[in-house]
């Protein structure tokens, strides 16, 4: 409110203002009426304007609050705080033009209006001016309250109310002058110009409030800046002086006009100054832009700065925690400080404060130690013995004691470089000390380089640490690419099992193409067998050994003919491989290693299918370390092999190939850097960048060569690659004998009998592989000797020499095995060492697993039985595993069928059986009968029919009780005289024996049960006991096709001869298998020791069976009863088949033991046990 309005309100009626004339009468009453009217009008307008501006003020306050929230924490500089002023200037000028008339009304000094406001001479114009003045000034006062309300205190409010209106006209004059002098361009400097002309202290606020009230001429940001331009100090004036105001209104400063309450809230009095309390607490985020004073020295907190302790504190000297002032605990506790003058902590004398700090630190250390001891005591109280603490200095990575020669690769592999390794090794040089088991494999004693425990990855043919130039061609044997012309180069190292003195004339390689690699047509045999290179019969297109001079004892053969161009092979490669390298290096191929991992290793791998071929090739090409490609580039021509040097006898490692690669890669890289020709530098430089993927200690999980996952992946890929490399040549070899297709499929199967039992449905082409010397291929000693050494021993390759004659054919390998089988195979291969020469006393895998593959080939196979097998005769009483069971009273109720019904049933059963003989795969008798001749079948049909009558169940106890127990007393020496007379017999019986995986063990002796050793079922003690009553099979088991006329058909001697050794074996196996179901009679159980004999003498069973069957069939020409019609048999078949379970005497608790009855004649046996037998027996 203006002073005039205050005066109008405060003045009583009739009270005169200064200078008014006290006239009475008519004029006074008129004047009073006019005054009242004016008062009412002014009050109404005042109320309206007040309401209007109150609403506007509230709106703007809410907007400003929102804006302040966003801008509060980010102190903005001058550039960001100034909005563009052009639009504001235009608005200001237009609004000024609108209001020029009202401004000019104020040209008359305002004091004059005030002086004459009460006189009669007051004109309507002056009254109107007074009204507008009061309105507009009220607006300005509201806006000033709006903008200063938060920061003004009572003094400021009083000041604005107490100031008189006498300066108002001068303010307007100054304002217009400043606008005109600046050429109507408003800027921040206008306020300074105005102030520099000596305006009184409150002038600027008047101008600002006026500007705000008339069209909001200033932008928000500028207004706020100008409003907050000075500090508020208690006293009659807001400003202490012009200088002070100008100092705080500089553009860089953002001082706000704050209330004392606000100041007290955010500052603390410190040494007589109001200091920003956040600064004193060390957490003022505004820094130099803070509104409050930071002029104080902070006391540091009595703690060491943890960031300084860790190495770097960003706050430096401004940090409120102690840095170098903190006392050094080593120096002050009496220990030696190894940092000396460079110590980060203070070595100054201790003060009271620093002594307290030091004591606190030392006590904390002691508390930690005491806490450990307390924990150990608690563990001991609970009965737990804590592990001893490791000695000091033992960390996660062991200190390297003996190292591989990273510093000087020229030295021997076994060289101890502890003197050279005094520098701290990098992570890539640290070699974890091996366990005791691996110590002899890593440099301690040099075993064969390619150990038989694990197939080395192909990268090691080239990345061995000896810097030998292995190739005499310019091309690189790229890891996954195809080799042209079927060239292989087995670069063997001097310590490997395949290393022998070179056999073959050295000669220059005949290369039609610079990318051809020298190939070998020789396979190196094991030390125990050959003693030198085993030269196999090679195809005419191959020949001519090339002896590389730098490798003493490395035989390399070169093809004499080239059947396809490298371009054709390049087109056959997978697209992934074609992208992986240039065309020249692509022509070196994975088949480069084919003879390096000889063909005999193919026994460990299943033939793969086509579908996975490209995948394996491409994966391996991506994963293979570039070392393989690099080393091949070392040679620049045929003469490059002469530059090969063999610095060291290579020590080998049985570690996984990924570990070997990680150990040998640094060495190979150095040799490549030293000896690489200049022409190959660009290629090597590019590939060296990829070598980091093979770093064993790399921390990147995404690199192929690092991490446990990639190591396992590498192992799987290497085994797949070995198979890749071995299989393509087998497909391209000459199809000489179509029967060998089956042999090839079986030859690639895994030797392990656990995997043998699963029949593989592998489909191979009939022209695949040609083993040239079958004696070498199928020698079981060699198979056994190398069975556990899948790719490591090159002795496996001594049995095959497979050459390509059509290298232009499509190189595709087949892959059927999944990763689980690969990992299992890796475990098997690394499980144990198998010596190269198999000692005679050691029993290895069942040789039948290999014989099954060769059953179609006529050849001599000599299998030795153990010495004790010929001299042991087992008595039945020696073989009783458990006491005999008591008879089942319920099952003895079953009565036999009348003869005619029984014979009809048997006849039907026999007819269906003979029709479906091959279908009963569970019955070993059917498997054997499928191979027997018709003569044998006619002679033995009676007995085999009995076995089939039980329903073909392998586990049926009655099937196991078909043997006369008296036969087992007789010596079984005759069976051993026929060791391997006819390979046809083994060929006919063994494949069927292996037909069903469940029968793999007892199958060899099973045919004898059927064909020759089935005594008549009327023998009472052979009946089944313990079966549930009423089963139909129990009735059928008692049915006998015995013909009384044929009593002499099989004498006891012949029966014993037939059944001697093999009968006991088969009975033992089948009887023990079913011993949980029924208690076997003494004749059923056999020699546990014969299992070894059975493992090694699979041929005896079939051979003895068939020779004895032939003998018995010649003597017994009487046909079986089944050849007669059923009606003709009615009078012939009397009850001799009667139910054996009723044969017991009433007082018998169990069947009579074998000892009592074995020596009695047949008649006495039947009279004793079978009261229903006919009188003539």
Swiss-Prot record:
Keyword field: Coiled coil, Metal-binding, Phosphoprotein, Repeat, Zinc, Zinc-finger
Annotated Basic and acidic residues bias: 1-12, 32-46, 753-767, 955-967
Biased composition (Polar residues): 512-522, 564-587, 713-728, 1050-1064, 1077-1093
UniProt keyword Zinc-finger, yes or no: yes
Source organism, top-level taxon: Eukaryota
Gene3D superfamilies registered for this protein in UniProt: Pneumovirus matrix protein 2 (M2), zinc-binding domain, Zinc finger, CCCH-type
Phosphoserine carried by residues: 1150
Comp. bias regions, Low complexity: 179-188, 493-502
Comp. bias intervals (Acidic residues): 13-31
Ranges of compositional bias, category Basic residues: 47-73
UniProt record, GO biological process: negative regulation of DNA-templated transcription
Repeat in keyword set: yes
Short name of any one Pfam family annotated for the protein: zf-CCCH
First and last residues of each zinc finger (C3H1-type): 271-297, 299-326, 327-350
GO function terms (MF aspect): RNA binding; zinc ion binding
Residue runs in coiled coils: 27-73, 347-383
Region annotated Disordered, chain positions: 1-137, 179-206, 383-416, 446-587, 622-654, 670-767, 780-826, 942-988, 1043-1101, 1132-1162
Entry protein name: Zinc finger CCCH domain-containing protein 6
Name of the coding gene: Zc3h6
């Amino acid at each position: 409110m203006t002073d005039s309005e205050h005066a109008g309100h405060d003045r009583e009626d009739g009270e005169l203002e200064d200078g008014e004339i006290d006239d009475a009468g008519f004029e006074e009453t008129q004047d009073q009426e006019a005054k009242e009217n004016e008062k009412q009008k002014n009050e109404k307008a005042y109320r309206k304007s007040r309401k209007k501006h109150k609403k506007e003020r509230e709106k703007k306050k809410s907007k400003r609050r929102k804006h302040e929230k966003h801008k509060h924490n980010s102190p903005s500089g001058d550039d960001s705080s100034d909005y563009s002023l052009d639009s504001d200037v235009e608005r200001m000028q237009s609004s000024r033009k609108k209001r020029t008339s009202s401004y000019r009304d104020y040209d008359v000094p305002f004091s004059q209006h005030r002086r004459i406001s009460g006189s009669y001479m007051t004109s309507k114009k002056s009254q109107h001016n007074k009204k507008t003045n009061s309105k507009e000034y009220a607006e300005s006062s509201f806006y000033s309250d709006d903008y200063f309300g938060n920061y003004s205190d009572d003094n400021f409010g009083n000041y604005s109310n107490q100031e008189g209106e006498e300066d108002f006209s001068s303010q307007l004059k100054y304002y217009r002058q400043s606008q005109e002098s600046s050429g109507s361009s408003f800027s921040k400097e206008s306020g300074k110009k105005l102030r520099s002309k000596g305006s009184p202290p409150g002038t600027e606020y008047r101008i600002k409030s006026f500007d705000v009230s008339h069209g909001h001429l200033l932008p928000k940001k500028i207004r706020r800046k100008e409003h907050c331009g000075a500090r508020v100090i208690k006293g009659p004036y807001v400003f202490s002086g012009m200088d002070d105001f100008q100092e705080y209104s500089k553009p860089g400063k953002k001082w706000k006009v704050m209330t004392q309450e606000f100041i007290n809230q955010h500052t603390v009095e410190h040494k007589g100054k109001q200091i920003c309390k956040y600064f004193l607490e060390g957490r003022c985020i505004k820094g130099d832009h803070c509104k409050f004073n930071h002029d104080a020295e902070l006391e540091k907190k009595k703690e060491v700065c943890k960031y300084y302790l860790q190495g770097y504190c960003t706050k430096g000297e401004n940090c409120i925690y102690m840095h170098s002032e903190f006392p050094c605990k080593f120096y002050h506790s009496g220990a030696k400080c190894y940092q000396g003058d460079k110590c980060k902590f203070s070595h100054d004398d201790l003060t009271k404060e620093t002594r307290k700090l030091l004591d606190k630190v030392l006590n904390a250390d002691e508390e930690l130690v005491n806490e450990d001891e307390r924990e150990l005591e608690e563990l001991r109280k609970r009965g737990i013995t804590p592990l001893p603490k490791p000695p000091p200095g033992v960390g996660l990575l062991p200190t390297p004691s003996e190292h591989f020669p990273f510093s000087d690769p020229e030295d021997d592999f076994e060289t101890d470089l502890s003197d050279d390794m005094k520098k701290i090794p990098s992570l890539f040089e640290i070699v974890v000390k091996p366990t005791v088991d691996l110590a002899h494999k890593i440099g301690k004693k040099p075993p064969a380089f390619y150990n038989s425990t694990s197939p080395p990855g192909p990268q090691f043919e080239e990345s061995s640490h000896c810097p030998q130039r292995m190739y005499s061609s310019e091309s690189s044997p790229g890891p996954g690419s195809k080799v042209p012309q079927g060239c292989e180069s087995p670069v063997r190292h001097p310590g490997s099992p395949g290393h022998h003195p070179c056999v073959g004339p050295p000669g220059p390689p005949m290369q039609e193409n610079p990318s051809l690699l020298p190939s070998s047509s020789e396979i190196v045999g094991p030390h125990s067998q050959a003693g030198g290179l085993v030269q196999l019969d090679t195809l005419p297109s191959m020949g001519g050994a090339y002896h590389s001079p730098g490798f003493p004892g490395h035989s390399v053969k070169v093809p004499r003919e080239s059947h396809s161009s490298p371009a054709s092979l390049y087109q056959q490669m997978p697209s992934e491989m074609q992208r992986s390298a240039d065309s020249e290096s692509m022509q070196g191929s994975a088949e480069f290693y084919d003879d390096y991992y000889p063909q005999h290793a193919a026994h460990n791998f299943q033939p793969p299918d086509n579908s996975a071929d490209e995948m394996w090739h491409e994966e391996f090409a991506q994963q293979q370390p570039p070392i393989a490609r690099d080393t091949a580039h070392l040679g620049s021509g045929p003469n490059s092999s002469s530059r090969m040097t063999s610095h060291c006898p290579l020590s080998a490692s049985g570690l996984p190939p990924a570990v070997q690669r990680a150990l040998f890669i640094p060495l190979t890289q150095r040799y490549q850097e030293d000896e690489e020709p200049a022409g190959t530098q660009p290629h090597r430089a590019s590939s060296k960048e990829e070598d980091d993927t093979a770093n064993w200690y790399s921390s990147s999980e995404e690199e192929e060569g690092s991490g446990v996952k990639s190591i396992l992946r590498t192992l799987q890929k290497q085994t797949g690659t070995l198979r890749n490399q071995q299989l393509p040549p087998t497909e391209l070899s000459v199809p000489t004998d179509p029967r060998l297709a089956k042999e090839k499929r079986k030859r690639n199967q895994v030797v392990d009998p656990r995997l043998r039992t699963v029949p593989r449905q592998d489909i191979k082409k009939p022209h695949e592989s040609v083993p040239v010397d079958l004696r070498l291929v199928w020698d079981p000693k060699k198979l056994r000797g190398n069975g556990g050494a899948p790719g490591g021993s090159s002795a496996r390759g001594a049995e095959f020499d497979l050459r390509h004659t059509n290298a232009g054919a499509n190189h595709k390998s087949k892959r059927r095995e999944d990763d689980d089988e690969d990992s299992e195979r890796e475990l098997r291969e690394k499980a144990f060492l198998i010596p190269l020469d198999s000692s005679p006393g050691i029993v290895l895998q069942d040789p039948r697993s290999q014989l099954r593959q060769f059953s179609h080939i006529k050849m001599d196979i000599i299998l030795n039985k153990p010495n004790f097998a010929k001299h042991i005769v087992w008595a039945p009483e020696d073989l009783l595993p458990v006491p005999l069971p008591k008879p089942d009273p319920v099952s003895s109720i079953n009565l036999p069928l009348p003869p005619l019904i029984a014979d009809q049933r048997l006849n039907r059963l026999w007819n269906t059986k003979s029709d479906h003989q091959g279908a009963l795969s569970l019955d070993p008798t059917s498997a054997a009968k499928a191979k027997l001749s018709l003569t044998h079948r006619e002679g033995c049909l009676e007995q085999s029919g009995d076995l089939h009558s039980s329903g073909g169940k392998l586990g049926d106890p009655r099937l196991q009780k078909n043997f006369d127990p008296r036969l087992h007393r007789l010596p079984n020496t005759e069976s051993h005289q026929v060791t391997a007379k006819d390979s046809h017999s083994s060929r006919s019986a063994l494949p069927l024996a292996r037909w069903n995986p469940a029968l793999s063990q007892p199958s060899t002796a099973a045919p004898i049960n059927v064909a020759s050793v089935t005594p008549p079922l009327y023998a009472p003690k052979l009946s089944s006991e313990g079966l549930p009553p009423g089963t139909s099979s129990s009735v059928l088991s008692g049915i006998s096709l015995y013909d009384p006329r044929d009593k002499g058909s099989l004498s006891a001697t012949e029966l014993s001869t037939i059944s001697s050794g093999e009968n006991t074996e088969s009975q033992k196996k089948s009887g023990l298998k079913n011993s949980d179901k029924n208690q076997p009679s003494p004749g059923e159980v056999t020699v546990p020791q014969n299992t070894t004999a059975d493992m090694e003498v699979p041929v005896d069973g079939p051979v003895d069976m068939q020779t004895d069957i032939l003998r018995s069939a010649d003597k017994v020409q009487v046909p079986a009863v089944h050849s007669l019609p059923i009606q003709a048999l009615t009078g012939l078949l009397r009850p001799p088949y009667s139910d054996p379970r009723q044969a017991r005497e009433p007082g018998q608790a169990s069947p009579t033991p074998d000892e009592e009855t074995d020596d009695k004649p047949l008649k006495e046996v039947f009279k004793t046990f079978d009261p229903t037998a006919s009188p003539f027996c």
